Design a protein with these regions (language model features):
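N-terminal "arm"/small-domain region of PLP-dependent enzymes with the aminotransferase-like
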Residues: 1-33
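Conserved PLP-enzyme active-site core in the AAT-like
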Residues: 3, 10, 14, 42, ...
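Conserved N-terminal alpha-helix of the aminotransferase class I/II PLP-enzyme fold
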Residues: 23-70, 89, 93, 97-99
Length: 176
């Protein structure tokens, strides 16, 4: 029997390297054991330089959507004002999650296939004239291939309101 392994270029699932497939065949370690605590501690320490963080790293064993939901629920309260930048399917998913839990969801629509224009977005925030707790966006809106200027946006948001949370669904290169 011949085994075919397709080349997957989607956001998930992705191909698993042979070394990891081999490691999966090792004996299981109990998640409440001392061995597991040591493995987890080593993993957390090893992830800090990968993400360029001095802060604690959290591992969530869930889908990307669950991580988006967890980030929202741990940043803002139900009566806070939050802003979602929607420029494709994943921004729309952020919006759907937000509308499930929050009373004051402000949606900043960007034409699908276009990146957010930082100055226009800051003008939008000023016109809202409400205390915004958090802004949510994506580094790369995978559904359209658009990369948002999150570094510039992060700096502009900090200048606008230093207490504002800026949550980016993306990789370590997109962190401000």
């Amino acid at each position: 029997m011949q085994y075919y392994q397709p080349l997957l270029l989607t956001p998930g699932p992705t191909p698993v390297p042979e070394q990891i497939l081999s490691a999966v065949q090792l004996p299981m370690v109990g998640h409440r054991s001392t061995d597991f605590e040591e493995i987890a501690s080593e993993a957390f320490k090893g992830l800090k330089p990968v993400f360029g963080s001095k802060n604690e790293v959290l591992i969530l064993t869930s889908s990307g959507t669950s991580v988006l939901e967890a980030s929202m629920l741990n940043i803002a309260n139900p009566d806070d004002h939050i802003v979602i930048i929607v420029s494709g399917a994943f921004g729309n998913r952020f919006k759907q999650i937000a509308q499930t839990y929050y009373n004051h969801v402000h949606v900043y629509d960007v034409n699908w296939g276009e990146a957010v224009i930082v100055d226009d977005f800051i003008t939008y925030l000023k016109q809202l004239n409400v205390p915004v707790t958090a802004v949510f966006t994506q580094f790369c809106e995978t559904s359209t291939g658009v990369i948002h200027p999150v570094h510039q946006l992060g700096h502009a948001l900090k200048a606008f309101d230093n207490s504002l949370y800026f949550i980016v669904d993306g990789d370590r290169k997109s962190v401000v």
